[in-house]
């Protein structure tokens, strides 16, 4: 390995998270309290909410700030409705404070008929905002590269970040939480039919978002365990690292994830170790997977059919990518990245080809 890249890698390994952010989208403003009551923030790696934590609540936007027992700052944003401008602001805040790799977006959906029917449109709007903001973020980062190309490579590291926030910014941690309400159970079959459609829609849509997940929670305290696991995985608190995460740690009856979770972990690990060298390649590949334009027509059709109580849409109407195909694509990308990073780069190639690839 080139001496400069090796030094960069060693510096990255020494860094520990100093801050992270959670953006919770939904009208359930008590979600943070529920997460705390069910052990997501207490015990183990987390401390309970401090009494002196900062609290702001204004017109559907709530902000709380607290610290883990390891003094990791946690910014918690709760918003009832996400707009493009607000999302841009929150992403900018995360980028400036700790990097996009330590940002976790949670969308909470109550399992009621009205919420489930309006959910697909809200989800697609969020994904559209995510894609737009990420593209703008990439342009900003690329401009920073152009401005800094005469400086040392290590100087590009954000002093408050665990990574360079370049390739890892493409992989936003995104989770949809389906919250089961006691009074909504067993009322009528319309809710059950909508739930079935939503799961089908979610599984298909989130195949295009590599680091996405679906979690179902209820009054049962054990149903919150998966959120706890996800938080450890996303933020890598203490000794919990991606390499320690396996699909077996997930309860299959309460959580559904796109395939190749372990492969995604490997891709993220490589990106963290070779952020600069792999920026352009990974950015291009993962932006391609976040293309949801084909789903927009599906949304209009599916909602119309739900409102008219028509038959469910068929599998053939959904632009679906099989797990096997998705797995093979991810494995191919990982192989390309591994091969790329394994090439022996000398100092001259760093100065010439690397910068040339990054800024073109």
From Swiss-Prot:
Function per UniProt: Component of the cytoplasmic dynein which acts as a motor for the intracellular retrograde motility of vesicles and organelles along microtubules. Promotes oscillatory nuclear movement and efficient pairing of homologous centromeres during meiotic prophase.
This protein's name: Dynein intermediate light chain dil1
Entry keywords, A to Z: Acetylation, Cell cycle, Cytoplasm, Cytoskeleton, Dynein, Meiosis, Microtubule, Motor protein
Family listed: Belongs to the dynein light intermediate chain DYN3 family.
Entry GO CC: cell cortex; cortical microtubule cytoskeleton; cortical microtubule plus-end; cytoplasm; cytoplasmic dynein complex; cytosol; meiotic spindle pole body; microtubule cytoskeleton
Posttranslational modification: The N-terminal part is acetylated.
Subcellular location: Cytoplasm, Cytoskeleton
GO biological process terms, semicolon-separated: dynein-driven meiotic oscillatory nuclear movement; microtubule cytoskeleton organization; microtubule-based movement; nuclear migration involved in conjugation with cellular fusion
Any one Gene Ontology molecular-function term assigned to this protein's record: dynein heavy chain binding
Organism of derivation: Schizosaccharomyces pombe (strain 972 / ATCC 24843) (Fission yeast)
Summary of subunit composition and partner proteins: The dynein complex consists of at least two heavy chains and a number of intermediate and light chains. Interacts with rga3, sec10, sec16, syp1, rvb2, spbc19c7.04c, spbc2f12.05 and spac3a11.10c.
